[in-house]
Amino acid sequence: MKRDILTITALLIMTVANAQEERRLITMEEAVLGTGIRTESRNYRWQEEGSTYTYSDESTIYVIDAKSGKTISETAVPKEEEQKEGPKPYAYSEKGNVYYTDQDGNAQAITSYNEPGIVCGETVSRNEFGISGGIFVSPDKRRIAFYKKDESKVTLFPLLDITSRTGTLQETRYPMNGMTSEIITLGVFDTETKETVWLDVTDFTEERYLTNITWNPAGDKIYIQVLDRNQKNMNLNVYSAIDGSFIKTLFSDSDSRYIEPQYPIYFMENNPEQFIYATNVRDGYWNLYLHNTDGKLIKRVTPVDADVEYLTQNGNYIYYYSAEVSPIDRHLFRTNIKSGKTERITKESGWHTCSLSPDGKYILDRYSAHNVPNNINILSADGKKSTNIFSAPDPTAELNFIPIEQGTIKSADGKYDNYYRLIKPLDFDPSKKYPVILYVYGGPH
């Protein structure tokens, strides 16, 4: 969002006086709606097995071998009348209740609440703390965990809907500071016994947050990062998915300012008795830590003074993003969980988004930078080989404006670099003084 605002601002600061004949000024409609200045992209995706990937244009779906770069097959994109609606997901929420699809393809209700303010199977806590869904299916699909949200005592807040011709008020329940919040519980439905159990969560007060729900690989336990409403204390608890009972607290994190859990735990594929835990409380930055299922800390996986984010794992390798190269870049690294040897995978400056092929041999790397609209490369798993498969043209090439500058300014104490982007008027004269608009993002992230 911030990048979009800065880009639009730069394009609006153009003047007709210095417009080069072969370039043009952006229109107000293009600036506001983003039409005509969008970066071209392609939706490359790995196939379910091996190291082949697909992408499509308006007429054709291509399947390509990552090793050779050769096209394996081409099929026509189905016509609109041939495109059928896909099947219902295995478990889903509809009108505030949870359903699953049985072996015969029929929808079966798990919950049947109709009280105002009771919602099941949907995201809770305003999508904070890494919460992005409300249904969690066990690895073997036998059990379905789901949030139940009771917001019946939460204050109704009016919002103006400007999409209607005259404008209408729509009410939503919003837990204001210091006022009653929603009450969250977690149910577990067994598709074999057709019974639901509720996890016995008793930490803190009932206005606690249940965050980052994680199944163990066997599908009989659930791990929850339970956070108090003051957001200063978090317990990583494990519960029985069979009867809902509390088993134990593995460990707790606390901070006098606030705690903000963001990620689930990640069980080791080659050792289900160990998992990766991410936190920024212990060493000042988001880092990864290896624990066993008794809660004991085995090692700090990423001992760097920078924020990192877990991506995936393959054998003994943990792949993760890191800001250690530059706080305005995101690079992919991997570390050997046994030896501790770490390798930087991506080399080009920019913001990288990567995915590992199912066979673990290749990486699909999408990245953009200050002067790179959108590049897509195929990398070897160790990053030593790189093949470019797509480079987007510059969407501003025909537009008349001065390129945005980047740089750093030292903090007042001289210890830290503050990064900036500088947007100058098209007729900028370095001998003159100009008023400056300084925009600072004041949020917590």
Where does each model-flagged region fall?
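A short helix->beta-strand "capping" segment at the edge of beta-propeller domains
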Residues: 21-39, 194-201, 404
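Predominantly five- to eight-bladed beta-propeller fold
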Residues: 69-71, 110-135, 146-199, 384-394
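Short loop/turn segments that connect beta-strands within beta-propeller blades
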Residues: 66-69, 102-105, 190-194, 241-243, ...
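Conserved beta-propeller blade repeats
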Residues: 38-54, 79-92, 117-143, 171-178, ...
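Serine-hydrolase catalytic core recognition
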Residues: 156, 219, 353-445
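Beta-propeller domains
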Residues: 55-78
